[in-house]
Every structure is written in C-alpha cells, then in structure tokens.
A protein has these predicted regions:
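Conserved catalytic-core segments of large NTP-driven translation/proteostasis enzymes
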Residues: 1-99
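C-terminal effector modules of nucleic-acid-centric enzymes and ribosome-associated factors
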Residues: 47-52, 66-265
Length: 265
C-alpha cells in the first residue's frame, strides 16, 4: 500500500502495486499487522478503470468494506490470508554503491515495497563486503514485516540518502545465527534461486519432526498448494508425504532413514 483516502458514499480506498496472485471483486483480504479482521473487496480499479479482477504487476485501487481510514498507513500489506511477520531474515545482498564497504555488522535502512525499517546487517560468509560483491547475510529488522522467500528489497545507508544495494529474501523464518558454520553457508547457498523443495526440507530439518502442510505454509508465509507443489517437484523423494485425518503431513527422507536405523537397532 502506498496511499489511502476516503470517498464519500464508498468508504476507504487504498492504492498500491499487486506483487502476486489474483484478486477479484467480493474476495476477502486481510490488512497485515494492524487489522486482523476480514475485509471485503467492494470495488477494484486498475489504471483508473473499474475491473473485475487485478493480478501481479497491476497498479490498483481497492475499495474495502469494514476498513477505517485511520487503520491504514504507507507500507502495509494486503493479502488473502494472515501472514507471519518477521524481524529476522536470511538473504543475499549485492553491494552496488561506489567506494563502499560493509563490515561484519552494519546499520542501514531496509526497504521492501513501500515499507521501510531500520536494520542491522550481519555478514554470514565473509567479514567485509565491497562494491560489486554479493554476500549471504542475516538482516535484523527493528520492527517486523510480513516477508516471503523470494521477496526483493533495497538497502540504503543509515541516513537513507544513498542506495547501497539490494537483495532477495532466502528464508523469512530463520534461527538467530550467532555463529557462522560451514553447514549454514552451504544450506543458504542451496536456497539461492528460491528452490521451494529445499526451503520446505529446511523447515522440516529445523522442526526435527513431521509437519503438516498447514504448519509449513504458516511458517513460510506460503499457501498449502505451494507446499504440495514443492513435494511433487522434490528431487529423489527428499520430501515424503502422508495423507492423514489432519491433512497432508510431510516428513524428510533423512528423518525416516534415521528412524529406521533406530528401530533396527
């Protein structure tokens, strides 16, 4: 969302850019982080003309039933479900500003969409990041944001007058990396390019137990259909699905192999 206003006889209108998916008139959306109640889409406009649906890439205006103008601020996100906000993100960061160098810890400003947050940048795979280089980083946001794997962002200097570079979110629900072991770097490197099966496998390794597709979707800010597609495309059956009364349950192949060895022993 980049703007909001009230129209007599219609109520609150918000404008912004559609980042993904499709939205239709009478669909239900949620304002992330502020208003958890469902909001109905009364009317949609795209480039000034009323339309029945909007999709990724469109500039759009939404007239929302049940939303008070005072609840809206620039940088908020509308989605078809309630997303998990995070203040800790693993990402890639490419530094483009000339004659600039970042140390292992640096203060900066993080911008994603129209949202802006103060951030501490922690380099994971090196001690210095220079102009023209790309690093694996963990970003510590001062205030949480609803972010997803694959989201792109820009980083500016702490006074927000120079753009330092940009990057892409790899993992929006990581552990706090106090150390930088080789296995962490290898795991994050496998996430570059947003391979969804690897991200789901990482979530299962962190949990050290089977997880439902619903749990994984909630943790990663995905929908359950995306999790199901990850299972279908996982290489060499690394993700093993089970249909249960609670729905789809996923187990990593390594978890099953370890369990089998324990039972045999």
């Amino acid at each position: 969302i980049d703007r909001s206003f009230s129209v007599s006889g219609f109520g609150t209108v918000v404008t912004g850019t559609v980042l993904g998916g499709t939205l239709r008139r009478d669909d239900t959306v949620y304002l992330q982080g502020i208003n958890p109640k469902p909001l109905r889409v009364r009317r949609l406009e795209c480039y000034g003309a009323e339309v029945a649906a909007i999709q990724a890439g469109d500039r759009a205006a939404l007239n929302l039933a049940g939303l008070d103008r005072t609840d809206v601020q620039r940088g908020l996100v509308l989605a078809d479900r309630i997303l998990r906000a995070t203040s800790l993100v693993d990402a890639t960061l490419a530094l483009h500003a000339p004659e600039t160098e970042l140390g292992i810890w640096s203060q900066a400003v993080f911008l994603a969409g129209t949202a802006e947050r103060q951030v501490r940048v922690h380099l994971l795979d090196r001690n210095r990041l220079g102009t023209g280089e790309t690093a694996l980083v963990q970003l510590h946001l001062q205030e949480p944001l609803p972010l997803q794997p694959g989201d792109r962002f820009v980083v500016r200097n702490s006074s927000c007058d120079v753009t330092l570079g940009g990057g892409q979110v790899l993992d929006a629900s990581p552990l706090h990396h106090r150390r930088r072991p080789v296995r962490l770097i290898e795991s994050l490197t496998r996430l570059i390019g947003s391979p969804l099966p690897e991200l789901v496998a990482l979530e299962l390794r962190r949990a050290r137990r089977p997880l439902t597709a619903k749990e994984i979707a909630a943790n990663l800010n995905l929908d359950q259909e995306e999790v199901a597609r990850a299972v279908a495309s996982s290489p060499a059956k690394t993700l093993v699905p089970f249909d249960t009364k609670e729905g789809l349950v996923l187990v990593s192949r390594s978890y099953l192999d370890n369990l089998g060895r324990l039972l045999v022993a």
